[in-house]
C-alpha cells in the first residue's frame, strides 16, 4: 500500500539529487549519483525549499487533521525566518514565494505562474483536500488559476497513481497524455509551472524505475531540483520508498526532520 512516506522520501531524494545542478543548462553535465556542492555549495543529500515547504504542509495536517492555509502560511514563514523544516536553514527561495510570505498574499499575475506551489503539492494527495482546498494552498504563494489548476491536476494524478493506475493513465486523465510520445527536446525544464508538471510526468511515463525517473529529471537541466522533486514524489508513489537506491537514502540528510512531519 502506497503511503505518504513513499511520496515524501521520493521527493526529498529527487530534490537532493538536483540541488547541485540547479540552473545548469541541459547536456552541460550528466548526473549519475548523489553528489554535493555545485550550485549552492551544499553537502550531498541536502534537499531544498521544495521539500521544506512540503514538510511544512505535512506537519500542519499532522497536527490539525485538516487543510488550513493560514496555518501552512505560518509554517512557511517559520521555515524562511527560523530554519524550520530544514537541515541547515534556508538557502534557496523563489521570488514569488518570498514576496507572498512578506505580504500574506499569493501572486495572482500571469508572471506569477512559477512552480513554487506545484513543488510542495503531492502530499495533499494523501489528505481529504478538496479541489478548492488544493487551490487555496497553492494561492498562499501562487494564486493565478494556471498554478492553482496545475496543483489540482497534480493531486488528482497522484491519487490515481496511489490507487494503482499506470503513469500513462494518470497523465491522460489530467490532459497530459501527450507526454507519452513527446521527444526529450519538446520537454522544457525551467521554472514555469506547466513546464515542470509536463517534465515530471514525462520522466515518470518514459522510465521504468525510481532511479531512472529522477536521473532523467535532473538531466533535463535548469530547474533540476524542482523537476526531480515532483518527479521523485510521483515515482515514490509508483515504486515505493523501498525502491530508492540504498546509497541515496543513506546519503539523504535530515531524515529525522522528514519523519517527524509525516501523518
Regions found by a protein language model. Give the residues of each.
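Structured, active/binding-site neighborhoods that engage oxygen-rich ligands
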Residues: 1-263
Amino acid at each position: 500500500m502506497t503511503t505518504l512516506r513513499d511520496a515524501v522520501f521520493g521527493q526529498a531524494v529527487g530534490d537532493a539529487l538536483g540541488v547541485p545542478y540547479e540552473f545548469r543548462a541541459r547536456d552541460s553535465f550528466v548526473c549519475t549519483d548523489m553528489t554535493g556542492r555545485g550550485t549552492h555549495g551544499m553537502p550531498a543529500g541536502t534537499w531544498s525549499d521544495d521539500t521544506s515547504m512540503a514538510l511544512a504542509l505535512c506537519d500542519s495536517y499532522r497536527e490539525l487533521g485538516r487543510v488550513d492555509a493560514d496555518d501552512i502560511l505560518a509554517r512557511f514563514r517559520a521555515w524562511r525566518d527560523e530554519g524550520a523544516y530544514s537541515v541547515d536553514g534556508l538557502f534557496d527561495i523563489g521570488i514569488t514565494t518570498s514576496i507572498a510570505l512578506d505580504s500574506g498574499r499569493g501572486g495572482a499575475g500571469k508572471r506569477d505562474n512559477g512552480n513554487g506551489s506545484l513543488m510542495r503539492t503531492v502530499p495533499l494527495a494523501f489528505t481529504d483536500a478538496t479541489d478548492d482546498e488544493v487551490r487555496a494552498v497553492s494561492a498562499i504563494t501562487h494564486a493565478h488559476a494556471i498554478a492553482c489548476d496545475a496543483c489540482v491536476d497534480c493531486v488528482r494524478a497522484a491519487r490515481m497513481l496511489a490507487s494503482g493506475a499506470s503513469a500513462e493513465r494518470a497523465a491522460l486523465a489530467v490532459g497530459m497524455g501527450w507526454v507519452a510520445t513527446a521527444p526529450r527536446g519538446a520537454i522544457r525544464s525551467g521554472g514555469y509551472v506547466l513546464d515542470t508538471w509536463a517534465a515530471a510526468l514525462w520522466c515518470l511515463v518514459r522510465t521504468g524505475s525510481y532511479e531512472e525517473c529522477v536521473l532523467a529529471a535532473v538531466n533535463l537541466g535548469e530547474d533540476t531540483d524542482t523537476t526531480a522533486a515532483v518527479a521523485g514524489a510521483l515515482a515514490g508513489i509508483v515504486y515505493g520508498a523501498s525502491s530508492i537506491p540504498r546509497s541515496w537514502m543513506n546519503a539523504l540528510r535530515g531524515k529525522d526532520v522528514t519523519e517527524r512531519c509525516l501523518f
